[in-house]
């Protein structure tokens, strides 16, 4: 049985994620707030979900240290703030959008990174397992005012999804099992969110 940690960045959506994961796995997952767990304790877990949250990654307790410590060792999925933190941990910048997305459904385009990943690291499974069986374009729920910037985007990351304005909506590491989504798979505004989470939990 995989041990799952939901790393809670003090967000009201965290328990929606927890309930979705527990529904899929039929097992309890552990939830710790970002300043209520020791960094070494995180080593007990196989898969880590970095929850959404208010503010910026550097204000979120152990969020950035966790990514820097465990990206090469653990399977990590970042959602919203968690996704932004993954970008930032590897050197990306964040930009503040003029338009705030709060409970807005928009289309995202999935970018095929399988070939790029296979070339970079033939031993790694295809980087887009997260989107396995999902259409190339899908509707997602968004609650954010910041995005990972394309300018200076780290060479060790891939962009896996974009919105209609070409903003980054998904990313993955080229060699580590680390992925992020700017949108909320646990939201009712993301009809295929459960399928996406099933893909990640099965990988």
Named regions from a protein language model:
Residues 75-77, 93, 139, 158, ...:
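Proline-centered loop/turn at the N-terminus of a beta-strand
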Residues 117-175:
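Catalytic beta-strand/loop cores that center a nucleophilic Ser/Cys/Thr
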Residues 37-45:
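Short amphipathic alpha-helix with an adjacent loop that forms part of the alpha/beta core around
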Residues 188-203:
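Acyltransferase
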Residues 18-26:
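Two-component/phosphorelay signaling modules centered on CheY-like receiver
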Residues 1-5:
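Extreme N-terminal starter segment of soluble prokaryotic enzymes
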Residues 27-36:
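A short beta-strand-loop structural module common to alpha/beta enzyme folds
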Residues 45-133, 197-199:
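Cysteine-nucleophile active-site neighborhood
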């Amino acid at each position: 049985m995989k041990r799952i940690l939901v790393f809670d960045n003090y967000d009201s959506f965290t328990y929606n994620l927890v309930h979705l994961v527990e529904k899929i796995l039929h097992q309890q997952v552990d939830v710790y707030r970002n300043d209520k767990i020791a960094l070494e304790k995180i080593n007990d877990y196989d898969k880590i979900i970095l929850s959404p949250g208010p503010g910026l990654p550097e204000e979120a307790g152990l969020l950035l240290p966790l990514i820097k410590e465990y990206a090469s060792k653990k399977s990590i999925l970042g959602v919203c703030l968690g996704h932004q933190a993954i970008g930032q941990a590897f050197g990306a910048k964040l930009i503040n959008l003029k338009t705030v997305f709060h409970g807005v459904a928009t289309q995202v385009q999935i970018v095929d990174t399988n070939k790029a990943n296979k070339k970079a690291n033939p031993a790694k499974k295809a980087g887009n397992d997260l989107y396995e069986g999902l259409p190339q374009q899908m509707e997602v729920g968004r609650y954010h005012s910041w995005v990972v910037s394309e300018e200076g985007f780290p060479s060790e990351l891939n962009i896996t999804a974009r919105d209609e304005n070409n903003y980054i909506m998904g990313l993955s590491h080229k060699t580590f099992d680390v992925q992020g989504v700017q949108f909320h798979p646990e939201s009712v505004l993301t009809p295929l969110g459960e399928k996406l989470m099933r893909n990640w939990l099965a990988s």
